[in-house]
């Protein structure tokens, strides 16, 4: 049955109780089922610039599932267990979604708004007891890397920092220029 009108909601709810439905119990299970049903359908798309002809990266459900599984396995390889926290301080990108999904499958995920100030980011890292942080590599016209580095100095619980480079989303000549003007800031922890 499809959902077309608000009254259809009751009909769908009356078909079976939520617990009696054959729904996946985990995020990984939900992604597995979706990729079985729609492997080649578009799942997510990202472009760094919003022009109609600007380069975009689109992932199918199969691609998203494979990359999410790879991210979850990477986090597990870094020692993340079910009760450990993976935090990310990232702008919107495909890597942000992969950090969210992979982190949630491997352990607990803590998204942190990159617009917060250093003290707020540090407080979230401490309060969540984040073990791993995924953040942006130094990039022109953004201070995410710098703020995260300063916050890490106030969050001794973090063991691993991973950096995402948005350079791959750029095309020439911007992709040639960014390495020359990239801020010289390295996250160390």
Residue ranges, per PLM feature:
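A generic structural signal for well-ordered alpha-helical segments
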Residues: 34-35, 102-103, 125, 152
């Amino acid at each position: 049955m499809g959902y077309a009108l608000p009254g259809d909601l009751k009909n769908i709810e009356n078909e079976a109780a939520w617990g009696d439905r054959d729904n996946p119990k985990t995020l990984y299970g939900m992604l597995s089922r979706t990729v079985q049903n729609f492997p080649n359908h578009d799942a997510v798309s990202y472009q760094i610039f919003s022009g109609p002809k600007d380069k975009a990266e689109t992932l199918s459900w199969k691609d998203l599932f494979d990359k999410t599984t790879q991210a979850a396995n990477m986090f597990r390889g870094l020692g993340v267990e079910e009760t450990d926290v993976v935090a990310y301080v990232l702008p919107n990108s495909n890597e942000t979604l992969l950090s969210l999904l992979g982190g949630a499958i491997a352990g607990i995920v803590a998204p942190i708004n990159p617009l917060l100030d250093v003290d707020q980011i540090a407080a979230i890292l401490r309060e969540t007891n984040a073990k791993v942080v995924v953040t942006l590599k130094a990039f022109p016209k953004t201070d995410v890397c710098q703020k995260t580095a300063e916050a890490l100095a106030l969050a001794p619980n973090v063991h691993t920092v991973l950096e995402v480079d948005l350079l791959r989303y750029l095309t020439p000549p911007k992709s040639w220029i960014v390495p020359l003007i990239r801020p010289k800031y390295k996250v160390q922890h």
